From Swiss-Prot:
Record-level Gene Ontology MF annotations: copper ion binding
Keywords, sorted A to Z: Copper
Keyword DNA-binding among UniProt keywords: no
Domain of life of the organism encoding this protein: Eukaryota
The protein, known as: Copper homeostasis protein cutC homolog
Designated gene of the protein: cutc
Length: 280
């Protein structure tokens, strides 16, 4: 596998992290807010400012936007589905102006631990022609084979709908499943990931390993999976530049980030991943 084959998607939740990821050689950005919460929908301001940055600097990179209206589980009510639809429509508007915004990231479940096929299919169709990644809500499902088959059936259904539609336009599809193999990290779930890779053969779905991937284990993961894309964070913790600090006031609940530190992508870590992957 040549060095050009390996691509790294980097999750980012600030413009500074976006710039670091781009300068570090990321192939794709997963654009979010609040990575502390697992990633939520980014603000319009962040999307527009990133659009302006890549246009002004003539940068070519794929950007997939997280569509997740709140933290917590992935069981959404109809009001939350409506919010997600509006957010997808906004991403499509930005995509029409800037082709780098080429995909969205979603994940919806039923209360019994199955994929919410009905609403997922609606969002995939609405997102067309953007690519769709189904995120690690997949790892929270009750059965990975059942879940994969459900997502693949959505692709088959949307393809048939597109063939029967004479209005033109792209065909909405789920292009990737982001997964740690139903475990807390990719290495722990590697056997399940290998089974998912087998299931994906002959389909339009690419398995995208993500979760606990480090420079120390990336070579092992590449050798075991033989995939060409991996999802990483590559973050470091930076100290706040605030000189005055009121340590008696907190902006969140008991489980929260400190107001005086923040995580940011480190371009050197991304370059380290790239260098490590080139040794395979």
């Amino acid at each position: 596998m040549s060095e050009q084959d390996i691509k790294f998607e980097v999750c980012v939740d600030s413009l500074s992290s976006c710039i670091e990821a781009i300068n570090g050689g990321a192939s794709r950005l997963e654009l979010c807010s609040s990575l502390f919460s697992g990633g939520l929908t980014p603000s319009y301001g962040l999307m527009k400012t990133l659009k302006e940055y890549i246009e002004n600097h003539e940068i070519s990179i794929d950007i997939f936007v997280m569509i997740r209206p709140r933290s917590g589980d992935f069981l959404y009510n109809q009001d939350e589905i409506t919010i997600m639809k509006h957010d997808i429509e906004l991403v499509k508007q930005i995509s029409n102006q800037c082709s780098s915004f080429s995909g969205i990231v979603i994940g919806l479940l039923n209360s019994d631990g199955t994929i919410d096929k009905c609403n997922t299919e609606k969002l995939v169709e609405l997102a067309s022609p953007l690519s769709v990644t189904f995120h690690r809500a997949f790892d929270m499902t009750r059965d990975y084979i059942e879940s994969f088959n459900t997502l693949n059936s959505i692709n088959c259904s949307t393809s048939n709908n597109n063939n029967n539609n004479n209005s033109g336009g792209g065909c909405g599809k789920i292009s990737r499943i982001l997964t740690s193999g139903m475990e807390s990290s990719v290495l722990e779930g590697i056997d399940t990931i290998k089974e998912l890779i087998k299931l994906s053969n002959g389909t339009d779905i690419t398995i995208l390993p993500g979760g606990g991937i480090t420079q120390k284990n990336i070579n092992k993961i590449i050798k075991k999976t033989k995939l060409k894309e991996y999802h990483i964070s590559a973050r470091t913790v930076s100290d706040s530049k605030m000189q005055f600090r009121n340590t008696s006031v907190f902006m969140g609940g008991s489980l929260r980030e400190s107001e005086y530190t923040y995580a940011i992508v480190d371009k050197n870590k991304i370059q380290g991943f790239i260098n490590k992957s080139n040794t395979n």
